[in-house]
Design a protein with these regions (language model features):
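N-terminal secretory signal peptides
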Residues: 1-35, 47-55
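Long beta-strand-rich cores associated with HINT superfamily self-processing modules
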Residues: 70, 542-568
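N-terminal lobe/hinge region of extracytoplasmic solute-binding protein
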Residues: 89-140, 171, 242-246
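Gly/Pro-rich hinge or "lid" segments in bacterial periplasmic/extracellular proteins
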Residues: 122-124, 213, 220-273, 277, ...
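Surface-exposed binding/hinge segments that line
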Residues: 148, 183-230, 253
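Ligand-site clamp/hinge motif
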Residues: 150, 237, 266-311, 417, ...
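Structural transition elements
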Residues: 249, 368-402, 420-423
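Extracytoplasmic/peripheral linker and loop segments enriched in polar/acidic and small residues
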Residues: 439-450, 477-546, 568
């Protein structure tokens, strides 16, 4: 490959110091083409610009490279077929559909049918994609981010979208407790307050952060699944009756615990949908969804786990879209309650788990082992030199004895009924028993499990709790919400000023190499402390019949049907 230095010099003109730094890192080989796309788009370099720079460096632009491996794909050859209804199986939402409070897969699948974000984090693309924001850029230290908005956008109720709507939306999402109740506080806590959101002009919004943050665009993207833009003054408690948003579809009907229908939004700013309508049917668990696909009662399963899905995973009758993902499970241990006040006990639990065995048995290989910290293969900043923790029963027993538990102990783990999690709970119980740890299981449905806050919550207050975490394009939420002293989801009650300081340093870093250095420190620190066990990373899976084309899922359970269609 030959580098075109003249073209590269031309493309450098007018670029910021940070943008030129990333170009330097690419040219020197310190930054891979894949990581250049991800980090370049994060700081606001457009997809066409990134592609042109890659082309000038030699080879293809790579700007459309998929971040997934797919058996079956989201696209197909031939002209799209217009018309018809696409039938989708989805997990039942655990509560009323409310973007301000949503925290479950079924709810967020519903929200993105009519709602849109400033930025789209597509698992099928490496670079962040403009949605309601056309462009974004940071100041020199990443403490202020400026977003240029798409103009001519109309909500599906006929009302124009303005900068005032964007400002109001993020002020609601970032309102701190106790007045604020947004689930987005897991993202915005310590990062953004309502006072930091400002309208600059009719098409520009500025975010002044509480501290510099190099990954902030992910915080206002589809990763922050409740952050759809709504009209100023929206009553979120009544959103389920309108599904007001700027997306390609608008609400046809919604029946709690049964399903929903959507029809094209005639005022949509983008390409119009091919479908006449979409129909979602809700299911309380995965087995009936698989049976519905096999019985031709639905065309698509929005998201599923590989456990118990061999009949569709191994059949040529179905298309399977497989996405690289940071979906994972977290086993929190209360660091303020005996015996988990001693990090040796927490480490002992971690050493009992057979991670490769769990990936093989529960994920059918559609995932990878994790290492007891929230940095995984999806993230460019992960320090891959840190050794992988493996099952070592002898080591676990040694740690327990040193901590004063030579005969083990008995405790209770709370968990939820969702995908493979009940089976994972059984695996953890069986593995821990090999070291003398007796774990009693308390497994409930998601409505009960997530229905309360600190003080009366099965997942936030249990001595041990096993919980699902959806995909994020950057690890910041995983680093802060469940682990920092003021984290909104700190079920482990992990309060450590050294860790809090490291997370602040990581968040503030704009440079990828600096992020990697700090990530390595965090990884090693968490391996020593082990407030949370991370068994594995899970690939995102969506299934459809062979007649379905144009699906655009994310591994956080969103399903975009803007360009979906059914071939004859």
């Amino acid at each position: 490959m030959t580098r075109n230095n003249g073209e590269l010099d031309r493309l450098r003109e007018g670029r910021t110091e940070l943008e030129n730094h990333y170009i330097d890192e690419l040219v020197s080989g310190n930054l891979s083409r894949r990581d250049f796309l991800r980090r370049g788009s994060t700081i606001g370099m457009s997809v066409p610009l990134l592609g042109a720079i890659l082309a000038a460096c030699g080879g293809s632009s790579g700007s459309s490279s998929s971040a997934s491996s797919a058996s079956g794909t989201s696209t197909s050859a031939g002209a799209p077929t217009k018309g018809g209804t696409l039938r989708v199986a989805s997990v039942t939402p655990s509560a009323a559909i409310n973007p301000l409070l949503v925290a479950d897969a079924g709810g967020l699948t519903m929200i993105n049918q009519t709602g849109e974000f400033l930025i789209f984090d597509s698992n099928l693309k490496l670079a962040l994609q403009p949605m309601l924001a056309l462009s974004w850029s940071p100041n020199s230290d990443g403490s202020v981010w400026t977003f240029k908005l798409r103009t001519g956008v109309t909500f599906n109720n006929g009302q124009p979208m303005t900068a005032d709507d964007v400002v109001w939306t993020f002020q609601q999402l970032s309102e701190p407790a106790p007045k604020g109740t947004s689930s987005a506080l897991s993202t915005f806590g310590g990062v953004l307050t309502p006072a930091g959101v400002k309208k600059v002009d009719a098409s520009t919004v500025e975010f002044t952060l509480e501290a510099p943050n190099g990954n902030f665009p992910y915080f206002v993207s589809s990763d922050n699944y409740g952050a759809i833009i709504v009209p100023k003054g929206t009553d979120y408690s009544k959103w389920q009756s309108t599904f007001v948003g700027t997306g390609a579809f608008k609400l046809g009907s919604y029946t709690p615990n049964v399903g929903a229908t959507f029809v094209p939004n005639p005022n949509y700013w983008g390409a119009k949908p091919y479908l006449d309508s979409t129909s979602f049917k809700f299911y309380s668990s995965q087995p009936p969804m698989i049976l519905a696909l096999q019985g031709n009662d639905v065309d698509v399963i929005a998201q599923f786990a590989p456990a118990g899905a061999a009949a569709i995973l191994n059949s040529p009758t179905y298309k399977i879209i497989k996405l690289e993902s940071a979906n994972h499970r977290e086993l929190s241990m209360r660091t303020d309650l005996a015996p988990f006040t001693d990090p040796r006990v927490r480490q002992a639990v971690a050493y009992t788990i057979d991670r490769p065995g769990a990936v093989a048995a529960l994920l059918s290989g559609d995932g990878s082992v994790a290492n007891d910290y929230p940095f995984g293969p999806r993230y460019p900043s992960t320090d891959t030199s840190v050794p992988q923790r493996t099952q070592d029963i002898a080591k676990a027993k040694q740690l327990l004895a040193a901590a004063g538990h030579p005969n083990g102990f008995t405790t209770t783990m709370n968990s939820e009924i969702y995908q493979e999690i009940p089976q994972l709970a059984q695996v953890i119980k069986a593995d821990a028993a090999k070291a003398g740890i007796n774990i009693n299981l308390s497994i409930t449905n998601q409505t009960i499990y997530y229905g309360k806050t600190f003080g009366s919550s099965p997942w936030l207050d249990g001595t041990m709790s096993l919980v699902d975490y959806g995909d994020r394009g950057a690890p910041n939420v995983y680093l802060s919400a469940p682990l920092t002293t003021k984290g909104t989801w700190n079920a482990a009650r992990f309060h450590n000023p050294t860790y809090d300081s490291l997370v602040k340093q990581y968040a503030a870093a704009l440079d990828l190499q600096a992020q990697k250095t700090i990530a390595g420190k965090i990884e090693n620190f968490l391996l020593q402390e082990t407030p949370i066990v991370y068994p594995y990373w899970i690939d995102g899976l969506t299934a459809s019949t062979q007649q379905v084309n144009g699906l655009n899922p994310t591994s956080i359970a969103q399903l975009y049907l803007n360009q979906a269609y059914k071939s004859a």
